[in-house]
């Protein structure tokens, strides 16, 4: 999938799992071409009964469709995120309608963090850090550097998103964060 097809231009989502906490953070900027349409969008949220958090990059309507589908899968599989994510990825890859949705997601529960793509990928990040979106590589690099010096997952996420916002013109500094206590 090319960056143009999935609409990466316009957001940064970062997940950090550290010292018994998992955080997913996202900036608030929504861009259309080279125009900022909204500076304070909420691209990070709790799913289902609140035991799963997620963030998205890509087309907003597509992401909400995928969040709804994931919530249904979570309910069907008794809150088992990995199983629900694999089932969603199968549907996303094979369903004629879902296959055309243009979004990426990072989701996490108290045990696992996953990156979900429209290619059918369900990826567990190495080191408990994952990022997607136009500023994702900047945030990922900053977070990986910060884990050697900072213990708190939320502080790492905020600082890493600040770095991404300083570099990526499609990322701003209006950050939304969701946090869960982690077993890992």
UniProtKB/Swiss-Prot annotation:
Gene3D superfamilies per the record? Glutamine Phosphoribosylpyrophosphate, subunit 1, domain 1 (3.60.20.10)
* EC number(s) per entry: 3.4.25.2
Give the stretches traversing the membrane: none
Asked if the keyword Ribosomal protein belongs to this entry, the reply reads no
What does it catalyze? ATP-dependent cleavage of peptide bonds with broad specificity
Residues the record lists as binding Na(+): 165, 168, 171
A Gene Ontology term for the protein's cellular component: proteasome core complex
Which biological process, per GO, is one annotated for this protein? Answer: proteolysis involved in protein catabolic process
Q: What is annotated about its quaternary structure and interactions?
A: A double ring-shaped homohexamer of HslV is capped on each side by a ring-shaped HslU homohexamer. The assembly of the HslU/HslV complex is dependent on binding of ATP.
Q: Which family does it belong to?
A: Belongs to the peptidase T1B family. HslV subfamily.
Entry protein name:
ATP-dependent protease subunit HslV
Q: Which organism is it from?
A: Zymomonas mobilis subsp. mobilis (strain ATCC 31821 / ZM4 / CP4)
Q: What is the lineage of its organism?
A: Bacteria, Pseudomonadati, Pseudomonadota, Alphaproteobacteria, Sphingomonadales
């Amino acid at each position: 999938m090319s960056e143009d097809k999935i609409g990466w231009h316009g957001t940064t989502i970062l997940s950090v799992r550290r010292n018994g906490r998992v955080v997913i953070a996202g900036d608030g900027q929504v861009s259309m071409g080279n125009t900022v349409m909204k500076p304070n969008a909420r691209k990070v949220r709790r799913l289902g009964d609140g035991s799963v958090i997620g963030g998205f990059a890509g087309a907003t309507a597509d992401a909400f469709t995928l969040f709804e589908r994931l919530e249904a899968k979570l309910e069907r599989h008794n809150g088992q995120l990995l199983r629900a994510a694999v089932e969603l990825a199968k549907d996303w890859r094979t369903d004629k309608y879902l296959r055309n949705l243009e979004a990426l997601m990072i989701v996490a529960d108290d045990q696992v963090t996953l990156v979900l793509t429209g290619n059918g990928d369900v990826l567990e990040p190495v080191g408990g850090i994952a990022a997607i979106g136009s500023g994702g590589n900047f945030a990922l690099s900053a977070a990986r550097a910060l884990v050697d010096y900072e213990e708190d997952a939320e502080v790492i996420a905020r600082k890493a998103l600040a770095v991404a916002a300083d570099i990526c013109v499609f990322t701003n500094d209006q950050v939304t964060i969701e946090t869960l206590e982690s077993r890992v």
